[in-house]
Amino acid sequence: MRERRAGGQWYRLLPMRGRKRRRDRTGKSRHRLKVAPEQELAVRPAAVNERTEFGHWEVDLVIGARQEGVLLVAVERVSRLVRLVFLRNKEADGVAAAVERLLSGEVVQTLTYDRGLEWMRHERIAKALGAVSYFCLPYHPWEKGAVEQMNGLIRRYLLKAESFAWEEADHYWLELIEANLNTRPRRVLG
């Protein structure tokens, strides 16, 4: 650039002709899940928002350090019942299969997700569980506050710097964490 300001012409031979690179901001939408308007959180039934019916779940992932392992967290909105399962990665097919296994014995009316690409198979999950899927607005994780609160409680047991690349024998700890969270006294439950 100094050569250009001094009146020289050598900058024209450079690949970018001396221009600074700009970050592509239009590519951000490709990293989020596009959902239909009828699946927005704003159209979710009032009974879900008021927490009067059992069977409405919020689902999220907690990612281990260096992307090594993922913890699938499902929280029922009324009872605050928690279900946890360990996954090796957050590929959409594996996540969908895990949600189906995790909630197959539960009453499931609705599922609430964020807009991550790991939920691309939400239709498959909804069909298998006989539920309806709803999605938060982009970058609005507080719209599924029950599961976000639970993620914070889980981080008291599993630190952010901790990898989730566990052996099968270590799943005992996951069951222990789930039991502790489910038996935890809560003011909201009376």
Regions found by a protein language model. Name each.
Residues E106-R121, Y139:
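Acidic/histidine-rich, metal-coordinating catalytic segments
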Residues I63-Q67, L84-E106, T110:
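Active-site beta-loop-alpha junctions of metal-dependent nucleic acid enzymes
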Residues V70-L71:
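Short loop/turn microsegments at loop-to-beta-strand junctions
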Residues V107, A126-G190:
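Charged alpha-helix within mobile-element recombinases
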Residues F54-G64:
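Two-metal-ion RNase H-like nuclease active-site motif
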Residues D60, A74, R80, V99, ...:
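Mobile genetic element proteins and their domesticated derivatives, centered on retroelements
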Residues M1-N49:
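Basic, flexible linker segments flanking DNA-binding modules
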Residues A98, E123-I125:
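A short acidic, amphipathic alpha-helical/loop segment
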